[in-house]
Every structure is written in C-alpha cells, then in structure tokens.
C-alpha cells in the first residue's frame, strides 16, 4: 500500500539555534524538536533519563488511601488477594505487587483470570474466587477501572477493593449501559465515573498527570514505591524495574516521560540478568548478549509471556518471574515456548479464515469480522495484522451462541475507544485505550453495530486518514550519514511508540546493482554524487519495477551499522522509495 510522505519542517535558523543551545547536530536538533522538546531542561531529561525524574507516587489519586488500607491489612493479618490480568503487562504488574507485599512481610495471594473460564478483567467470578480464599482486601492491577458490578458485589460481600489500573475510565457525559450501578453506587471525579472502590489509583483520572501514560506495570511500580516510602525506604527500583520495563514495552505505551526511564534502566537490568526466570526465558528465546532493544523483546520474550494467557492459564508466568530456582525457571520457560508455538498455529488458522470472510464481505471504512469458533485468545493479534495490512480500524468477534466477544485495533487517525463509546448502546461491555479495546455484545446486534461503527468513522475520518503515513524526521544527504551521527542517535534510545527510530529522507539517488534477495527483500547500493552506501528493503521486492523504470529515486530509511565477520559499515534500512521528484 502506498504511503503518504510527510516531512517535518522547521525554520532553519531555529534549528541552528536549538542545535547550538543543546550541543547537538542540526539533524538531531530537528528530531528533538519533532519529539516536542523545547527547553534545554527537557532535552537533558529526554537524552539522560534517570530515577530523579520519577514523580511522587503519592501524587496519584487515592494512593495515600491505598497505602493506608494495605498497612491496616498487614496489621490485622488480613488475607490480601492481588488480582491481575493474563497479558504481559498484567502479569508483570501482578508480580511487582506480590513481590513488594512479600518483601514488606505482608501475606498475600494472587489470582489471574482464565480467559476461557472467567473472561477479561475484574468480574463477579473474581469476587467469588476472593470469597472462596477468604480475602478481605482485593488489589487489582491492570484492570478494574470499569468493573462497576464486581466492585458493588465485593462491597456486599464485605471485601474492600483497591483498583490500580491505567485503562480509560468511563466518561460521565456518556449514557450508562444496562447493568451499570446507579449513581448512588458510583463516585464522580472530574469528567469520569468510577467504581465505588475503597481506592482508585489510575493516572488517567488526572488531566495533567506526568504519569498519565504509565502501563499497568508502571502503576504497579508506583504502588510498590509508595508502600516502601511508607515504611521509610525509597530505593527499591532495582527490585522491580526489569518487570516494569517488560510490561511497559508489552503494552506499547508511549516511551516518553517516566516510561522512558523505566524502559532504559529496565532493559539494562534484563540484559545483565538478575531475574532467574527472565534468564531462562532469554535462553529459550535465543537471546544473547547484554544489549537489548524493545523491538527484540516484543518479538521474542513477550510473545512467550503472553502465550499461556491467550490459550490456557497464565499462573505459571508469575511463578517464572518470581522463582530463584534455575530448574523450575527452565521448565516453565520451555513450557511457555511450547504454548507460543501452539498460539502461532491457532493464530494463523484464524487469520486465514478472517481474510476469507473479508474477501467475501469487501473492505469497509471500519472492518468488522465475526465467526463461530474463532479462538478468543488470538483475535486481538489477528485484528492488529488486518488493521496494519488494510489501514482500517478492525474488530474481530468470536461468536458463542447469543454472545460475541471481540478485540478492536485502530489506525493512528481514530480513537477507537471514542468510536466504541459512540456505539455503546449496542454493547454489553467494553474497555481499553485509544488504539486497542475489548468488547462484548449480543450476536444478533452485530449487523447494526457494524453499520453504526461505519457511520461514525465516515463522519470522523477523511479518505486521507486511511492512507498510512511516513513521518520523515529530516532530509539528509548521503554524505552526512556517518558513524558519528549514529552514535548521536543512540542517545535517543530506547525507541518505541512516541519515540520512533529516526526516519530520514534523501532525494535524487542513483540505484546501483539492485536485486531481490531472500523472501521478497530488495538489496542495492545507493549513490549520491561521490557517496555510495548499501541499502536493504525488507519485504520491498514489489518496488523492483519502480527501480527498473526510474533513472533516480527518492528514499525513506533508517541508517544502521551492519556488523559482519568483525567488520562494521554503514547501511540503510529502506522503508519506502519512489521515482525521484528531482529528475
């Protein structure tokens, strides 16, 4: 699919001023400006994140109440149940809170819902489980912010609930779905309606919180930090940053602000191997070396952590992340590897079936696909793949009798949580973020729901919004692609959502020795005046015809250092190319 080429442009005089003020190159200055940085203090914090930049955990709403209630539970010897979620963010968040409580001598147990048996989130089934275990206090992590019924049931059972979550709260101005408790059972804070829990700790309740983009594991880290401060100890990050980094990367939250520090320091901890379970998982995933990047974890360790929660039971992941036994860790890691292979098989089957349904229905502004028997554990991944392929928001629904449960994935131009909110009369329940959500509705309502979503999207988006865009950070001549520049780019790491790897563009390039290699990849040399550099375009073999019919090309790329047999040379990772506009 062709993409829009959008070049960020700034007044050259301001770039020169900014570069001099911050002692960086003009290209890095342009990138930092693109990232929204304005002052030397902001630049310094971005390039050199450290723990001093962490905000006070007690600035989060209800944190003081939460800590006091946990302290009371400890003093009374109450049974505390930590209720997590079955994805990597929820599992790492659960491990953080359980580990913190045990380090403080507070007895606790944990519960991870089974996707098939219990469904998603904090539910009535969760309350029944807490009652069975004799818990008088439930701490939710990475879930609970829209669990009105479960919180109300907990109160009736005499069980207090502390919610720690980072998902979107329910907005007051939206009409309430059937089954939502009355206003007397709810608490209103700012523009949101919250469950009537003992405490609700969620940075999204605050409009201007510096912690607003924390993952579930990030919020759990804040709770752990607050608990230790309450006990007179503040330096506890070394116990939890590796887990918090994993959860942050897994949930694809912006790697800016506090998340940047969490991931940067956490990656270093993961790389140097202090967690027995993660060491085993790295070995099974084939990860070597101490220098890790988020992308490597996203495609190796994290899918294995996610796998059991998708197709079976995720409790063993907590054991893996908590154990000091190398034998136990390796046994669990090998089992996770098997689970991931099975997940891949199931996912591919559902993906191919979904493509068949899409071919029969045709592409609409908002793609909604449904069928009986699709495995609920993989429909989120399938939705992501179809959304990326067709540049459309996508919902994949698994139908079981009268009920359909699904996962939604969006494109950058659409807030999918807003779109679902506009159609909430069709839904039994839903929750999530701007780019991803989960939902449930009656099977018979699917056609009307699909029609409603498409009307919403047509009103909100233009044709251009459905065309994926390449946001080019800066134009560059090949003579300026250097080892020194790439060394400077290292200061921008870690890369991820909100801080992508720098994307550069160059014009009027001669193509030398272009050929297709491997499974649909494009390899060549690019020449500009006297400068020649190797280039590789993964999955870009379809551009071969463009190269053969063009005298010169324009290219978008990320530069990198190719290391092979002890040698290092500069190369370009091509993202797109076109006939040159300067021919």
What are these regions (language model features)?
Residues 2, 8-137, 157-158, 173-178, ...:
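Hydrophobic helix-and-loop "lid/oligomerization" segment in the mid-to-C-terminal part
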Residues 71-72, 188-202, 526-531:
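Acidic-glycine-rich active-site phosphate/pyrophosphate-binding loop
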Residues 474-533:
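Accessory interdomain/linker segments of ATP-dependent helicases and helicase-like nucleic-acid enzymes
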Residues 530-546:
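Beta-strand/loop nucleic-acid-binding surfaces
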